[in-house]
């Protein structure tokens, strides 16, 4: 399963992803760590400080390639935590992978506004979560929605 946690910067993607990672690690039927793909870490790894559309496309395509490899070769759950503002790139991931769950996270908080993407393409995710509550409450909401 590939979990795509996406939304504007500061919406809680990494925080929620860490909760999900811990949950999956402790499942009796799973027993191994999920592959974590954090957009900011990818930018550091591939030295991509380009926040234009071209730079974002490259970062997301790198993430999609890693997630596809983890799914098909490693048979591991993957948690993607990226801004991921382009529906066509999320659709590309779905073409190559059968088990993809999209969760759009949003907040009214004003965090990291200079990195926000104009014309963000929310698309039609399976789930949408407002993260203006505490991280613990957001995690509870996530578990209920995804029936974990």
Question: Which role does the model predict for each range below?
Answer:
Residues 11:
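ATP-binding Walker
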Residues 8:
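P-loop (Walker A) phosphate-binding loop of NTP-binding proteins
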Residues 18-65:
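Conserved substrate/cofactor phosphate-moiety recognition/catalytic segment
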Residues 2:
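Walker A (P-loop) ATP-phosphate-binding motif of ABC ATPase nucleotide-binding domains
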Residues 14:
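Walker A/P-loop
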Residues 5:
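Hydrophobic anchor at the beta1->P-loop junction of P-loop NTPases
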Residues 106-148:
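Small-molecule kinase domains that catalyze NTP-dependent phosphoryl transfer to phosphate-bearing small molecules
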Residues 54-97, 105, 109:
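Glycine-rich phosphate-binding loop used to anchor ATP phosphates in small-molecule kinases
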């Amino acid at each position: 399963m590939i979990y795509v946690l996406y939304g504007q910067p500061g919406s809680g993607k990494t925080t929620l992803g860490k909760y999900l990672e811990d949950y999956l690690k402790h499942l009796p039927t799973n027993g191994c760590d999920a592959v974590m793909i954090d957009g900011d870490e990818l930018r550091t790894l591939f030295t991509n400080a380009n926040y234009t559309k071209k730079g974002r496309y490259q970062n997301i395509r790198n993430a999609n390639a890693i997630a596809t490899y983890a799914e098909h070769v490693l048979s591991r759950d993957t948690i993607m935590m990226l801004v991921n503002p382009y529906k066509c790139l999320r659709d590309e991931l779905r073409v190559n992978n059968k088990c993809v769950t999209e969760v759009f996270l949003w907040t009214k908080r004003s965090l990291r506004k200079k990195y926000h993407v104009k014309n963000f393409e929310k698309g039609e995710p399976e789930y949408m979560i407002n993260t203006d509550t505490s991280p613990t409450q957001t995690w509870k909401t996530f578990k209920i929605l995804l029936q974990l």
